[in-house]
């Protein structure tokens, strides 16, 4: 069984608050203060979850430098109160950094259709027509 330290639990909470502030900042028409606060919380929480050394090693791998520069550059642009441009740069950097994780996430979401309760829920949401045409 995986043991989770108290610092990692705090990191999950801080990362969750960071994602919340980022989404709330986007909902409020790219409020630069909320986006900047969310970015700082997200990066702090990530470093608490996986550790400073692993965070640094993840972001500064040779094949991920382009994504890292766009992501951290976007964070800097948001901190300089250019939220729309900063979030666009961050989004591109995020996709570049985490593109290796997307197949795993989509595979997990695809397996959610095999869970008994969720499969019936998805069928009800889909409607009575099971035809693909």
Curated annotation (Swiss-Prot):
Q: Which residues lie on this side of the membrane: Cytoplasmic?
A: 1-9, 53-68, 114-133
The UniProt entry's GO CC annotations, sorted and at most eight, read: cytosol; endoplasmic reticulum; Golgi cis cisterna; Golgi membrane; nuclear envelope; trans-Golgi network
UniProt-listed GO biological process terms:
endoplasmic reticulum to Golgi vesicle-mediated transport; protein transport; retrograde transport, endosome to Golgi
Membrane-spanning ranges = 10-30, 32-52, 69-89, 93-113
Establish whether keyword Ribonucleoprotein is in the entry.
no
The record's PANTHER family line, in alphabetical order, gives: CGI-141-RELATED/LIPASE CONTAINING PROTEIN (PTHR21493), VESICLE TRANSPORT PROTEIN GOT1A (PTHR21493:SF245)
Lumenal topology: which positions? 31, 90-92
Q: Which UniProt keywords apply?
A: Golgi apparatus, Membrane, Protein transport, Transmembrane, Transmembrane helix, Transport
* Name of the encoding gene: Golt1a
Q: What is the lineage of its organism?
A: Eukaryota, Metazoa, Chordata, Craniata, Vertebrata
- Record membrane topology: Multi-pass membrane protein
Please explain the role this protein plays, according to its UniProt record.
May be involved in fusion of ER-derived transport vesicles with the Golgi complex.
- Family stated for the protein in its record: Belongs to the GOT1 family.
Instruction: Please state where this protein is localized.
Output: Golgi apparatus membrane
Q: What is this protein called?
A: Vesicle transport protein GOT1A
Check the record and name the Pfam families matching this protein. Got1
């Amino acid at each position: 069984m995986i043991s989770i330290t108290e610092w990692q639990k705090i990191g999950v909470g801080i990362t969750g608050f960071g994602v919340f502030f980022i989404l709330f900042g986007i909902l409020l028409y790219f409020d630069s203060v909320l986006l900047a606060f969310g970015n700082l919380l997200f990066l702090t929480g990530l470093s608490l979850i996986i550790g400073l050394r692993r965070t640094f090693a993840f972001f500064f791998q040779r094949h991920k430098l382009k994504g890292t520069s766009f992501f951290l550059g976007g964070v800097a642009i948001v901190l300089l109160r250019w939220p729309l441009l900063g979030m666009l740069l961050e989004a591109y950097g995020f996709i570049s950094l985490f593109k290796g994780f997307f197949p795993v996430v989509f595979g997990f979401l695809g397996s959610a259709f095999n869970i008994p309760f969720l499969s019936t829920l998805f069928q009800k949401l889909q409607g009575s027509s099971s035809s693909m045409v």
